[in-house]
Amino acid sequence: MRRIVVAAVLLAVLTARAQDTRFCGPPARDADGAIARSSAERARFQRLYPCPANGARRGACPGWAVDHVVPLACGGCDAVPNMQWLPTGSKSTTSPLAKDRWERAVYCTHGVAS
C-alpha cells in the first residue's frame, strides 16, 4: 500500500513538473562552463515589472535582484515567467534556510545537475 502511495505522489510531482512552463531542462552554458543568462530576457522582465525600489524599467535596482523561481541549475527557464524581484538580503544570507538552498532542495531532484 505504501509503495502505491509513494508511486502516486511521485507521478503527481512529475506530471506537475512536466506541465510547469518554468522548467526547460539542463541549462545552456557558455565557453567557460558557467550557466548562460539572457540579458535581453532580464531587460524584458524589468520592462514588464519595474524595480520595486525606484520604479525603473531599466538600469539599476538598488537593494533588489532578479531571481529565478526555479533555479537555472535545476532546469529552470531563463525567461520572464520564471523571474521575480527578491531583496538582495534574501539571496545573500548564509543561513541553511536561505532561498537558494531551499530551492535546490526542492527543485534539483530530477537529474538536472548544476
Model-derived segments and spans:
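Nuclease and nuclease-like effector domains acting on nucleic acids or nucleotide cofactors
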Residues: 1-65, 70-114
